[in-house]
Swiss-Prot record:
Keywords: Ribonucleoprotein, Ribosomal protein, RNA-binding, rRNA-binding
Family (UniProt): Belongs to the bacterial ribosomal protein bL20 family.
Keyword Ribosomal protein: yes
InterPro entries noted in UniProt: Ribosomal_bL20 (IPR005813), RIBOSOMAL_L20_CS (IPR049946), Ribosomal_protein_bL20_C (IPR035566)
PANTHER family, A to Z: 39S RIBOSOMAL PROTEIN L20
Its biological purpose: Binds directly to 23S ribosomal RNA and is necessary for the in vitro assembly process of the 50S ribosomal subunit. It is not involved in the protein synthesizing functions of that subunit.
Protein name: Large ribosomal subunit protein bL20
GO cellular component terms, semicolon-separated: ribonucleoprotein complex; ribosome
Length: 115
């Protein structure tokens, strides 16, 4: 069987990994073996955190809505329940933005939900 030299293929594979590892500290960005490990870990973290980001933002929005709702004398769960009963279709992201950017409008949303 003939010998197969992996010149082009191996070099392209290594350069792809090193290109992904650009900006990593020390040998993690310049030596192939350590760069390969760091890139694999970075890709795993990125995959996991893309899903975690959705949870984190939802928690942040809920915390902001709860804080603003309590200023208006109602708890978060009561507010969300009242909004559903009043058929006010506004999502948590928009409610949180209203609470931060325009508290008067948020207060009017709360009063419309109460009545």
């Amino acid at each position: 069987m003939a010998r197969v030299k992996r010149g082009n293929v191996a070099r392209k594979r290594r350069n792809k990994i090193l290109r992904l590892a650009r900006g990593f500290q020390g040998s993690n960005g310049s030596l192939f073996r350590t760069a390969n490990q760091r890139v694999m870990k970075a890709l795993c973290n990125a995959y996991r955190d893309r899903r975690r980001r959705k949870r984190d933002f939802r928690r942040l929005w809920i915390a902001r809505i709860n804080a603003a709702a309590r200023i208006n004398g109602v708890s978060y769960s009561r507010l969300i329940g009242d909004l559903k009963k009043a058929d006010v279709r506004i999502n948590r992201k928009m409610l949180a933005q209203l609470a931060v950017m325009d508290p008067k409008s948020f207060t009017s949303v709360v009063t419309s939900a109460k009545s």
